[in-house]
Amino acid sequence: LAKREKLRILLAYELRKQVVTRLVERIHNAERVNDMKQSMIDRLNELGGQGKPFVFCLDYEMSELILLEEPLAQQELLFDIGGVTNSLARSVSDTPAVLRAIPISEEAYAERFAVIRHALERGDSFLANLTVATPIELNISLEEVFLRSQARYKCYLPGRFVCFSPETFVRIVGNEISCFPMKGTIDATLPHAAETILGDYKETAEHYTITDLIRNDLSRVSHHVEVRRFRYIDELVTSRGHLLQVSSEIVGQLAPDWRAHLGSILSELLPAGSISGAPKEATIRAIAEAEGEPRGFYTGICGYFDGETLDSGVMIRFIEQQADGGLRYRSGGGITINSQCAEEYREVCQKVYLPFV
């Protein structure tokens, strides 16, 4: 009995030691991550304060920053942001683009959906953006996708990803900061498409939630925050036809010295509310559990600072290249307590498309 008791005490001690060791490792890892984040913020603040132009991509986890000065002269990252581009004239083939998707199974999606559903039922979240990665095959290069895509925010990093996003993160002109969260799409050819999407209860509830979240986020960095436009419609041209996209515009006023705090402002607003959810911190934890892998640059942000103004986008509509050369198309959608798994699964599958005809 004495030997057993000694063994039990020894095992308990070893277990506690392992737990403490793992806790210390997590603390050290967290400190390293925080140091990296602060370094990125400081660098953005520095360049903004100096009025130096740059282009950047910042990943969802805020663990990797691509930051290039003299953005129009470099060719490491091809970009076209709000019509400003470093993409030199290149010939584009007239080969019809063919994208073949190999979707994850509905059962696999349902497992992720169940994690989010449980968080909603517990009250941890009332809107969460659940995303998936769909393996695809393409008959054209990612550079060709970049060149042929029609989108306000386009980035191509060879060997890593191409992004062709319609969604603005923030624009800053003068001292005014603006956000344009997107929530809700519908096939533009459907009868009464605009009336249908604007009258949809679930879409309306999601839009109210995300607009309120963004308004609160902007209030952390600016004053006189207001919703200037609520649920207006844009039309998108895609390889699957025309879509109607619902957005809102929220604006605030920054302090005159905002350029010297540009990195800090962006950090306060990240991750974007439209691709995370509300309340943000608890929802991010639920998303991480459900998705089971880092998002990387997908749903991060890209932007161009010309020394005076900033234009940045949320990196949705995104194809990533894996180490073995395989391609994955990332897509997602907002989940609420009223969401149906089968409908959400269809939506993420339908979002796998190219933004050109």
Where are these regions (language model features)?
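Extended alpha-helical targeting/anchoring segments
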Residues: L11-V357
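Polybasic, lysine-rich low-complexity intrinsically disordered segments
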Residues: K3-K6
